[in-house]
């Protein structure tokens, strides 16, 4: 038990970047919390607003874009989400080089893109105004907002960034409900979208005024590609990639899943709002705990729990059970979203490099969010049901949780020693996977083997190379067997 406490202490204290003694992290105070709240306002207007695209898609398919398929219209939202994260590759380094003022121009463009969307009538217009301009301007705002909060906090970083990211959950509750009510009222499309634009104008104005960089701008190379030579950083981003391939599946498909099991359209619509409301608390509570036990301990824990809950989704077919799933999934997946930026920020060697590290991490996330939904859509079209979608999403998140555990061991054990411990952990997984039992038992209890492999590495390390390969591939093999049998 003492070794667990020691590892948590090492992770949370040793590895976050050290500020110079003359510039200690405030870890609180009016200015620091104002920045966290201001950044939360930015996420409310960007990430939170993007969560409302499902409402737009339902409206477009019966109104302006009725001649286009749902798959065609979905590209508007996919491109918007891709640029929301991908533009961080530019926004993060700009924050490190020029400070908080870099957020002003994209903040104006966010409002401009919403107002232009209200005037659109053709597909290419929606694609340009909402998909490309909206996504890019939001992404250029998002990365500096996250980076500004990270500059003010070290010991309380996960909690502070959880507060910031909770702004997106609040937006994910308010914007879909507001749009749903206004679009189908006497207001019509144009004024419904403009009212949303005015809401964003008010919140974004407060947010921009609240955000300040703590440290002076630092002249440096735009990207720090040498960061990808750090095993710790690469392991973290690999884990984040797999987590983001699967994490958004229920946000895209849960209403459709509910309707396919007899849920009314009205109740199914509110499932996303329920998820986002639960996610609000999921981005706060795990962040507070992460500051006590370490962000990687918390990230791997909530990732594995989220994956297990997603496997349980297979058996949830009644209205009550689907709503329970929505609440549980929203909370624990919110923990993943809330802790991820703190874990990435901890990889930076200096506080003035945090923006660049977060920006490069967001670029990796953008690829995952771009390919995840189409894979799920292809599985749904191929098999005509949700089983393969559920298994795929749960499996990649379980794998991401395992990798997050490996990144944690690398972070506080040193690169060589950490990799040896990770080998033992995966060998432990292989040992349990190969010892019989049903396939679902392998998937459900594989996470237990990670801990067993860490605690009993020498026992499980016989024929380690063979077992390592088996351990990494075992879970995916069982998933593929499901697909083969279903086909």
From Swiss-Prot:
The chain crosses the membrane at residues 35-55, 75-95, 99-119, 126-146, 159-179, 191-211, 234-254, 262-282, 293-313, 322-342, 354-374, 385-405. One of its GO terms (molecular function) is transmembrane transporter activity. InterPro entries: MFS, MFS_dom, MFS_trans_sf, Proton-linked_MCT. The gene is apdF. This is Aspyridones efflux protein apdF. Disulfide bonds: none annotated. Keywords: Cell membrane, Glycoprotein, Membrane, Transmembrane, Transmembrane helix, Transport. Residues 1-21 have a biased composition (Basic and acidic residues).
């Amino acid at each position: 038990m003492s070794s667990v406490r020691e590892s948590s202490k090492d992770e949370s204290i040793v590895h976050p970047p050290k500020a110079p003694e003359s510039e200690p992290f405030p870890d609180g105070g009016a200015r620091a919390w104002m920045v966290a709240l201001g950044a939360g306002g930015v996420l409310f207007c960007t990430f939170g607003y993007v969560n409302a695209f499902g409402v737009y898609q339902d409206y477009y398919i019966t109104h302006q874009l009725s001649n286009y398929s749902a798959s065609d219209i979905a590209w508007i939202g996919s491109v918007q989400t891709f640029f929301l994260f991908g533009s961080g590759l530019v926004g993060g380094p700009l924050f490190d080089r020029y400070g908080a003022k870099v957020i002003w121009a994209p903040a104006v463009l966010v409002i401009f893109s919403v107002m232009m969307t209200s005037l659109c009538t053709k597909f290419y217009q929606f694609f340009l105004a909402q998909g490309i301009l909206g996504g890019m301007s939001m992404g250029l705002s998002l990365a500096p907002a996250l980076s500004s909060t990270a500059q003010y906090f070290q010991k309380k970083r996960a909690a502070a960034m959880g507060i910031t990211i909770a702004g997106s959950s609040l937006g994910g509750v308010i914007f879909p409900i507001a749009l749903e009510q206004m679009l189908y009222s006497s207001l019509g499309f144009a004024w419904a979208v403009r009212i949303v634009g005015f809401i964003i104008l008010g919140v974004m104005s407060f947010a921009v005024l609240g955000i300040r960089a703590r440290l002076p701008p630092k002249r440096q190379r735009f990207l720090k590609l040498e960061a990808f030579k750090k095993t710790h950083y690469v392991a973290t981003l690999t884990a984040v990639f797999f987590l983001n391939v699967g994490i958004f599946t229920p946000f895209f498909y849960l209403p459709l899943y509910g309707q396919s099991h007899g849920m009314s359209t009205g109740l199914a619509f509110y499932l996303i709002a329920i998820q986002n409301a639960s996610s609000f608390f999921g981005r706060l509570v795990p962040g507070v705990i992460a500051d006590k036990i370490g962000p990687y301990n918390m990230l791997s824990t909530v990732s594995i729990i989220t994956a297990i809950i997603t496997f349980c989704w297979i058996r949830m077919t009644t209205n009550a059970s689907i709503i329970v799933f929505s609440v549980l999934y929203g909370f624990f997946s919110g923990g993943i979203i809330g802790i991820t930026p703190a874990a990435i920020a901890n990889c930076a060697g200096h506080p003035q490099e945090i923006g660049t590290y977060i920006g490069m991490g967001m670029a990796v996330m953008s690829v995952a969010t771009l390919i995840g939904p189409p894979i799920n859509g292809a599985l749904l079209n191929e098999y005509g049901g949700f089983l393969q979608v559920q298994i795929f999403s749960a499996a990649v998140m379980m794998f991401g949780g395992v990798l997050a555990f490996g990144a944690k061991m690398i972070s506080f054990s040193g690169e060589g020693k950490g990799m040896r411990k990770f080998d033992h952990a995966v060998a432990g997984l292989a040992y349990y996977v190969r010892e019989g039992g049903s396939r679902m038992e392998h998937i459900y209890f594989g996470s237990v083997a990670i801990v067993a492999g860490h605690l009993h590495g020498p026992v499980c390390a016989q024929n380690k190379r063979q077992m390592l390969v088996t351990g990494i591939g075992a879970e995916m093999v069982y998933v593929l067997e499901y697909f083969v049998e279903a086909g």
